Regions:
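Histidine-acidic metal/acid-base catalytic patches
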Residues: 1-29, 61, 102, 155, ...
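Active-site acidic/histidine proton-transfer and metal-coordination neighborhood
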Residues: 17, 54, 58-63, 76-180, ...
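Conserved beta-strand positions in the central sheet of alpha/beta enzyme cores
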Residues: 31, 69-71, 107, 144, ...
Length: 292
């Protein structure tokens, strides 16, 4: 197992600067975020131009860094056709670029029509996702689903794949061996779901793992209740309430021995490049205590 990170938090640096810093600090893996504000490579150019793909691969080799996945959540089931089609097109660009770069997986969301209940979205999964998975299978890429509810569309969110019962249904609809999870315990913690039990049950479907913590603010919860806002926040691993020793041991138990990517969304350790980098290094040192 190796500790890496998602590069979105270092968006102000160039791609080579990110790689150089990562090498200097002992990171071996990066999850490459592909949102417009964070994207460091031209996905379509990489996918269609062998010279550009080779240039990126040479840069990675120079700094001895491996890309664990190309990442963007996406709104693949959005009720607005333009947003939905653009999201699905970006997914395909990630898949094609991942194939050109020999990156094993892409990370994304299932998506959600936030105007509908979760169960009503299963019909949309059946409508849109088989073709998306065929594209991934044609390119030999794994698809790792993030389990974040994405509450930007409060209170329903725009990703239905946030709970074990939904994963069960999605994997039933889409029985591809190339569809799995990018497992992040932080979301399950604040949702009140036993993340260790979920990890054990779906261990064979864990393609990647993300390291983000959550902190429950009990004083605020007592005032706002579960349907209120501001009673939890994301933290760096080691600063919230996830039991990381138990989580990483369970990853080993279920047979996972790949990268664990720190996702830096900690409001306490933001505000400057120096704070972000020190936050990453804190969690790297903390998590490495559990890696053997």
């Amino acid at each position: 197992m190796r500790i890496g990170f998602i590069n979105a938090c270092l968006a102000e640096l160039t791609f080579e600067e990110q790689l150089r810093w990562s090498q200097e600090k002992g990171f071996k893996d990066i999850e490459l975020h592909t949102a417009p504000r964070t994207l460091k490579i031209d996905l379509q150019k990489v996918a269609t131009n062998r010279g550009e793909a080779d240039r990126i691969k040479d840069l990675l080799a120079k700094y001895d860094i491996k890309l664990s996945s190309l990442l963007l959540g996406g709104q693949h089931l959005h009720p607005d056709p333009q947003k939905r089609q653009a999201s699905q097109a970006h997914f395909k660009n990630m898949v094609a670029a991942a194939a050109a770069l020999d990156v094993a997986a892409v990370t994304t969301f299932i998506g959600r029509d936030h105007t509908l209940p979760v169960k009503a979205n299963f019909a949309l999964v059946k409508k849109y996702w088989p073709e998306m998975m065929r594209y991934a299978e044609e390119h030999g890429r794994k698809v790792a689903i993030e389990n974040c509810p994405m509450l930007d569309e409060w209170p329903s969110g725009y990703n239905i794949a946030f709970a074990p019962e939904v994963w069960e249904e999605v994997f039933s609809i889409l029985p591809s061996p190339l569809l799995g999870l990018n497992f992040d315990p932080s979301h399950l913690l604040w949702l009140g779901i036993d993340y260790i039990a979920a990890l054990k049950k779906f261990g064979s479907k864990v393609f990647l793992a993300q390291a983000k913590d959550s902190e429950i603010l009990k004083d605020r919860l007592d005032q706002a209740g579960f349907l209120g806002e501001g009673w939890w926040r994301y933290r760096l691993p080691g600063l919230g309430q996830v039991d990381w020793g138990k989580f990483i041991n369970t990853l080993y138990e279920v047979g996972y021995d790949g990268p664990v990517s720190i996702e830096h969304e900690d409001p306490i350790w933001e505000g400057s490049l120096d704070k972000v980098q020190r936050g990453l290094l804190f969690s790297q040192q903390y998590l490495n205590r559990f890696i053997v």
